[in-house]
């Protein structure tokens, strides 16, 4: 999977967080988190609380998103992500993905290593 597609998959999952069941979007986002990121933000229950907390709750059930490439190499990519949340407020994030170089079934997969704190960008109206 292309690195941008990893970001898009995660955002689309969060956009429909409770489909097909409660918190499936967060779980799918977790599955694409780099092992180093999982160590910092996990286990999964803690990750769920983090995403539902004040810093990242605007990602849950957001209305739309755009993903713009900032930097890409053969092992790392950074994207600017803008989301319109369910309250019609825009937020910007820096989303970093890296190619996993650890042995195992995720070897050579692009996985999220970091997501910045959101930057409020104002209302859509």
Regions found by a protein language model. Give the residues of each.
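Short, aromatic-enriched amphipathic alpha-helices that serve as compact interaction elements
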Residues: 2-18, 32
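Proline-rich intrinsically disordered, low-complexity coils
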Residues: 3, 20, 35, 118-120
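Context-gated lysine
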Residues: 4, 16, 22, 48, ...
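Residue-level signal for functionally critical sites in structured catalytic/ligand-binding pockets
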Residues: 10, 15, 25, 79-81
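Detector for Asparagine
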Residues: 12, 17, 36-37, 65, ...
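Short solvent-exposed beta->alpha transition segments
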Residues: 20-74
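Exposed beta-sheet edge and beta->alpha loop/turn motif
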Residues: 69-125
